[in-house]
Amino acid sequence: MNIKPLGERVVIKKLEAEEKTKSGIVLTGTAKERPQEAEVVAVGPGAVVDGNRVAMEVKVGDKVLYSKYAGTEVKVDGEEYTILKQDDILAIVE
């Protein structure tokens, strides 16, 4: 992958949705909840505010939760990624 996000943008790769519910029900492709957990694969340099660059809060390798309909989906070398603003990331999963 060779995507270099600009500004305060982040490239994420979605983690797979659960195949089964906690009670053991197997979900089909259309019944699965759209995943909101992803791994950060690239991070931009950060926004410039009043002439100063603001450091990014996420880093490559972080697992994050993000807004359900945030970002733009792109396909590179057969892999699907989402490019979104750091503000669309809700939390880092530790």
Curated annotation (Swiss-Prot):
Annotated S-S bridges: none
Subcellular localization: Cytoplasm
Keywords linked to the UniProt accession: Chaperone, Cytoplasm
NCBIfam families: PRK00364.1-6, PRK00364.2-2, PRK00364.2-4, PRK00364.2-5
Organism: Clostridium beijerinckii (strain ATCC 51743 / NCIMB 8052)
Gene name in the database record: groES
Pfam family, one: Cpn10
Name of the protein in question: Co-chaperonin GroES
Transferase keyword on record: no
Entry-linked PANTHER family: 10 KDA HEAT SHOCK PROTEIN, CO-CHAPERONIN GROES
